[in-house]
Amino acid sequence: MEDFSEQQLFFMRRAIEIGEKGRITAPPNPWVGCVVVQENRIIGEGFHAYAGGPHAEELAIQNASMPISGSDVYVSLEPCSHFGSCPPCANLLIKHKVSRVFVALVDPDPKVAGQGIAMLRQAGIQVYVGIGESEAQASLQPYLYQRTHNFPWTILKSAASVDGQVADSQGKSQWITCPEARHDVGKLRAESQAILVGSRTVLSDDPWLTARQPQGMLYPKQPLRVVLDSRGSVPPTSKVFDKTSPTLYVTTERCPENYIKVLDSLDVPVLLTESTPSGVDLHKVYEYLAQKKILQVLVEGGTTLHTSLLKERFVNSLVLYSGPMILGDQKRPLVGVLGNLLESASPLTLKSSQILGNSLKVVWEISPQVFEPIRN
């Protein structure tokens, strides 16, 4: 393992930071940042903003204030080595005769997978790998997981009262948390490419499930709303079927044919699966999302869906918001019966906690040996 200086770590952390600017718009590509340094001074920066657009390295070179020959380049993910919508970034760095390249992470995508690093070294460029590795892994976690497992990273998000109730006695769950927490949820939605919701939540709250900025404006890229409804119980007039964001309706043979025709007239695509004891076939849903190269799935309820996903081991992370209220025993828990005894309960790792206004956000991660999905 290389020993890197604090200054070198600073430059890599800057590359990771600017890479986050593409977090919402870059998927299914990774949100990569690049910094060009000459004589310990940043002369160029760039990040990958959208699929099909210029890569971080190309933009950093374009934005450089002087020729970059002999410079050091810091990039949060291995430069690509293949021809796609853009030429290989490794070739670009070779062409501009950079001196050294610092890479936080090897790209697990089979199209790259160390080949970019090999190309640079074959051209006589010094390459150092692993600087800022943990920070880059945290930033690119959904991308890394999807490219490694060919499966989306799944976050179960919920808002609950201090005493753990996710809804009141009438089943209403909106406005449990403060505005600051709801703004954070809007960003979390924007960072996801799909939102899963069960029919009961739609019937109770009639949510939009759109990703909105604090000022109320929509984020430039909206997630796919995936409505799971095995019997056709969600009214076609529900807000999730409006044109603000794309929607996928998932159902079973129990759904009336006339209902599907109505959705067809609204241009809402329908995915038919076999019936299961918990409703729709979640494995078929995830197969569909994997085919669409969805990197991150956000689950927004309700209790039945949460329970099914945890039992089937689809959930990787929990994001829990606690609101400033006590609802009492409403029989509205976050999760239903899992059948766990204390000694066999899923181990969680606390990743972070944050005060948002008058609410508390806590992020937990389920241990890797637990969250590998059970494949049919």
Swiss-Prot record:
| PROSITE patterns referenced in this protein's UniProt entry, alphabetically | CYT_DCMP_DEAMINASES_1, CYT_DCMP_DEAMINASES_2
- What keywords sit in the KW lines? Hydrolase, Metal-binding, Multifunctional enzyme, NADP, Oxidoreductase, Riboflavin biosynthesis, Zinc
Cofactor(s) the protein requires to work: Zn(2+)
Positions of the UniProt region annotated as Reductase: 151-376
* Pathway named in the protein's UniProt entry: Cofactor biosynthesis; riboflavin biosynthesis; 5-amino-6-(D-ribitylamino)uracil from GTP: step 2/4; Cofactor biosynthesis; riboflavin biosynthesis; 5-amino-6-(D-ribitylamino)uracil from GTP: step 3/4
UniProt: Zn(2+) binding residues: 55, 80, 89
Q: Is Cytoplasm found in the keyword set? A: no
Q: Which reaction does it catalyse?
A: 2,5-diamino-6-hydroxy-4-(5-phosphoribosylamino)-pyrimidine + H2O + H(+) = 5-amino-6-(5-phospho-D-ribosylamino)uracil + NH4(+); 5-amino-6-(5-phospho-D-ribitylamino)uracil + NADP(+) = 5-amino-6-(5-phospho-D-ribosylamino)uracil + NADPH + H(+)
Cite the EC number. 3.5.4.26, 1.1.1.193
Specify where the region named Deaminase lies, as residue ranges.
1-150
Q: How is the cofactor bound?
A: Binds 1 zinc ion.
Q: For NADP(+), which residues are the binding ones?
A: 159, 175, 201, 205, 230, 302-308
Cross-referenced NCBIfam families, in alphabetical order? Answer: eubact_ribD, ribD_Cterm
Indicate the family of this protein.
In the N-terminal section; belongs to the cytidine and deoxycytidylate deaminase family. In the C-terminal section; belongs to the HTP reductase family.
* Name this protein carries in UniProt: Riboflavin biosynthesis protein RibD
Q: What is the gene called?
A: ribD
